[in-house]
Each structure stands twice: as structure tokens, then as C-alpha cells.
Amino acid sequence: MTTKRSLKALGVMLIFAAMIAVGMLNSPTQVRANGEGSDDGEKARIHRGLAIAPVHLNLHNKDRDLVGLGSYLVNGAMDCNGCHSSGPANEYIVPTGNPYFLSPPFTGKQQINPATYLGGGRDFGPFPGDPFPSIPHLYSRNLTPDHTGRPSGGLTFDQFRNIFRNGTDFDHVHPMCTAGPGDPDNCLVAPFNGDLLQVMPWPVYQNLTDHDLQAIYEYLKAVPCNPGPDIEGAPYLQNTCE
């Protein structure tokens, strides 16, 4: 009897242990390990980000993994340079110069102009030919690091995060108009809010994690300083590199 009871107890213990093992194998932790949020997934994004960076990166005193992830987000997912550049930002290697003209089909290869990369200056302001523009010139900002080594005119990370979370315009470039359009210069008419960035899609980007924002910030610290375009009425685009 004692032997039978011992064997029965042992069998119950083995079944219980097997149930625990199956549960662990099918736990959310294991599912995450096979998903995009896994360490392997992030390593792949870091590797791809470092591979597609279009300019030389200064990795001295930088977190290499954060820089790689930031490059993946800036260059591979968000196309920040598409807005934060002036002049010929991208030159697609196809005979037509346009990746949407299939001659031949676009293969993903492009050349980035380092002279304009993330230097700002693209105008999202009045429509051409509008005799009574209701909005001023809205230039994309210079995102590259200044002489402090911090991006976008020396922003701290807290300021940088605030921009993504709340759309805050720390430059206060566009005050609210007090006496109609254009008074004062560069003013925004109601219902636009002069304290907010008007073009940047921060209402979407505010959903990025702090880790993602830290990666973007670290990447922007690693790109070369761009002195920015010389545009009349937009001195805030100028960057002091040294």
C-alpha cells in the first residue's frame, strides 16, 4: 500500500510539474520573446538603424544601441529628413528621379544630401500666389546638435520630450496675431495656437515610449552639426556648431 501511495503521489507531482512547464512555455513572456518587442527584435532594429544612417555618426560618449535604434526610427520609420531639410533632400536612384514612376521599380536605394540633412528650412507656409496669406512662413527646424552637443538648438532631453508629448514650441517663433494677419510679423491667426508647433505631427508622435524618444535624442546628438539655411526672417534656423 505504501509503495502504491508513493507512486500515486509521484505521478501527481509529475503531472503538476508538466502543467507548470507547459504554462511557462505559453506564457506572455515567451510570446513577447518571439515578437517585435523582444530583445532580438530591438537588436535587429539597432543593426538596421546603424546600417542605414546616411551620415557619419559621432559615437564618442554615446550609447551605440540607442543611436542605432534612433537611426532606425528617424530614417527608417518616421522620415524626419523629409520635412527637416531644405533643397534637394533625397535623390532617388531611378532614371525618372521619382520612386513612384516605375522605371525601373524602386529598390529602396537613395542618396541623402549631407549638406541639408536634418538642417531644417522647408517652408510649410502660405500657398504660392496667395495675395492675402492667413498663415506666415512655417519653416521646419534644424534638428542637428549645436556647440553644446545637444540637438535642435541645444534642447535638453526634458524639453525634447515635451515637444513630442505636448507640441511645445520653445522658440515661440509665431505669436498670436493681435491686429489681423501679419501683425505682428510671423503671427498666427486664431484658432491656431502660437505656443504649439503647427506642422510637426506631435499628436501622433506623443504615443512614442520614453525609450524611443531617448533613442531619437541620442541619434540626433550623434549626427553632424548643420549650420542651417540662411533664410531672411528665420534666424532661429541657424546653428552654432563650434
Language model features with spans:
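Electron-transfer interface patches adjacent to heme c in soluble/periplasmic c-type cytochromes
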Residues: M78, P99-R165, D169-V173, W202-L213
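N-terminal secretory signal peptides that target proteins for export/translocation
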Residues: M1-L7
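Electrostatic cytochrome c docking/interface patches
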Residues: R45-N75
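Sequence/structural segment immediately N-terminal to covalent heme-attachment motifs in c-type
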Residues: D63-P88, I93-S103
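Extended intrinsically disordered, low-complexity coil regions enriched in Ser, Thr, Gly, Ala
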Residues: L155-N162, D169-L197, P227-Y236
